């Protein structure tokens, strides 16, 4: 019995390994927030376990007027639908900002669309956030598709 369970675990791990891929990429967004210009860069790296699930980590840099902030962002991406060229995803993420006293954290879900250029390259767009954010010492709902909530970028798979 132990041998059968061990063989099954080896087979499952091999199948996961065959479909798994590392990726790097990043995006950018810009817009106006309360009469202030905002620009942000979002580099990221991650690991695709299979056709449906990926996890990753992002480091971001945001500039609002003359203030510069940084953040870290672990995320998990789930592919809801695809046709081998277009992918509709939902990304669960938690963003932790540093360099700001007013805004500390943001958690929630982001809808995303990816377009496959070839086996290595994809372009993507993330739109908005559905969740909560910690602002000024309080948690409040976060919902929106404003210009600063739309990110476009590229992904490269190894």
Walk through the language-model features, giving the residues of each.
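Sec-dependent N-terminal signal peptides
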Residues: 4-14
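Sec/Tat signal peptide C-region and signal peptidase I cleavage site
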Residues: 14-20
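Transmembrane beta-strand segments of Gram-negative outer membrane beta-barrel proteins
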Residues: 20-32
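Residues that define the transmembrane beta-barrel architecture of outer-membrane proteins
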Residues: 22, 37-41, 68-72, 103-107, ...
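Outer-membrane beta-barrel "beta-signal"
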Residues: 23, 115, 144-158
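Gram-negative (and chloroplast) outer-membrane scaffold detector with strong preference
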Residues: 30, 44-123, 155-158
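Surface-exposed strand-loop-strand hairpins of Gram-negative outer-membrane beta-barrel proteins
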Residues: 32-41, 137-141
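Membrane-helix boundary connector in multi-pass membrane proteins
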Residues: 115, 132-138
């Amino acid at each position: 019995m132990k041998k059968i369970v061990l063989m099954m675990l080896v087979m499952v791990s091999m199948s996961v390994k065959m479909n798994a891929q590392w990726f790097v990429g990043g995006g950018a967004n810009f817009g106006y927030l309360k009469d202030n210009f905002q620009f942000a860069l979002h580099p990221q790296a991650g690991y695709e376990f299979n056709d449906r699930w990926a996890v990753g980590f992002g480091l971001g840099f945001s500039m609002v007027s003359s203030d510069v902030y940084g953040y870290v962002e672990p995320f998990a991406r789930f592919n809801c639908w695809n046709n081998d060229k277009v992918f509709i995803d939902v990304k669960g993420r938690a963003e932790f900002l540093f360099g700001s006293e007013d805004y500390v954290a943001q958690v929630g879900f982001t809808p995303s669309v990816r377009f496959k250029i070839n086996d290595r390259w994809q372009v993507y767009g993330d739109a908005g956030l559905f969740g909560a954010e910690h602002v000024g010492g309080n948690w409040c709902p976060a919902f929106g598709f404003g210009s600063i909530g739309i990110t476009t970028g590229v992904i490269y798979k190894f």
